[in-house]
Amino acid sequence: MDHIHLLLSAHGFTRTRLAKSKPIVVHAIAGSGKSTVIRKILSDLPTPKAYTLGKPDPYSLSNPTIKAFAQFKRGTLDILDEYGQLPLTDLDSSFEFIFTDPYQAPTDNLFEPHYTLETTYRFGPNTCNLLNQAFQSNITSLVTKDNISFGSPYLVDPVGTILAFQPDTYLILCLHQASFFKVSDVIGYQWPTVTLYLACKISEIPEEERHLLFIGLTRHTESLLILGPDAFDSSP
């Protein structure tokens, strides 16, 4: 158990003032390396088993992996990633460490954290500026460059992987026979270039849907194109 706390500190996680309790709660921003830390725990220690409500690791014969939550069986030291996708009342008491990005989860699903990290390796400063303005966050990046652009869905063609946010955008993309993912289905995924379709301005998205907006805004590593009805007024 002490080794896990040392690993969290070594990877830049900040210990809060919250007294240790079960489970140990770790909140980390998208692209901060929390999955990397979990895999390091699995490789260093024989006991822990890790599960996720996001994207599981591919099967491996040689390395321990983060498994899908559907495969969960109680063990000696259980770890859960993306716990924020689960109502707190459904969280099994056997989990010793639980991780999530708090901005990607409904606020009712969150505990107070013992550790936090708001530095990302995924996207760059332009995305951080947009997120910090929209979510009153304090996210920083170790990536030096990225690109964000806005456009009209009627004038600009999508590029890269297409993500859709809100039912109105699902309908439009289906009518055009475009291949896309719903934002709610891409937790744990990333692509170099992403186009995000919005049905309204970022500032008009209701509070109960803002965690989904955050997911949509953080799937890219290089470039994000935001297409909405108010092409140049979609920023916060």
UniProtKB/Swiss-Prot annotation:
One Gene Ontology cellular component annotation held by this UniProt entry: host cell cytoplasm
GO BP term, pick one = transport of virus in host, cell to cell
Q: Give residue ranges for domain (+)RNA virus helicase ATP-binding.
A: 1-117
| GO MF, one example | ATP binding
Q: Which SUPFAM superfamilies match?
A: P-loop containing nucleoside triphosphate hydrolases
Give all residue intervals belonging to the (+)RNA virus helicase C-terminal domain: 118-236
Ordered alphabetically, the record's keywords are: Host cytoplasm, Host-virus interaction, Inhibition of host innate immune response by virus, RNA-binding, Suppressor of RNA silencing, Transport, Viral immunoevasion, Viral movement protein
Q: Which domain of life is it from?
A: Viruses
Q: What is its main location?
A: host cell
Q: Where in or outside the cell?
A: Host cytoplasm
**One short Pfam family name for this protein?**
Viral_helicase1
User: What does the further note read?
Assistant: TGBp1, TGBp2 and TGBp3 seem to act together for cell-to-cell propagation. TGBp1 is the main movement protein that physically cross the plasmodesma with the viral genome. TGBp2 and TGBp3 would facilitate TGBp1 function.
Protein purpose: Transports viral genome to neighboring plant cells directly through plasmosdesmata, without any budding. The movement protein allows efficient cell to cell propagation, by bypassing the host cell wall barrier. Increases plasmodesma size exclusion limit. Acts as a suppressor of RNA-mediated gene silencing, also known as post-transcriptional gene silencing (PTGS), a mechanism of plant viral defense that limits the accumulation of viral RNAs.
Q: Which family does it belong to?
A: Belongs to the Tymovirales TGBp1 protein family.
Q: How does it assemble?
A: Homodimer and homooligomer. Interacts with capsid protein. Interacts with host AGO1; this interaction targets the host protein for degradation, thereby suppressing the antiviral RNA silencing.
Q: What is this protein called?
A: Movement and silencing protein TGBp1
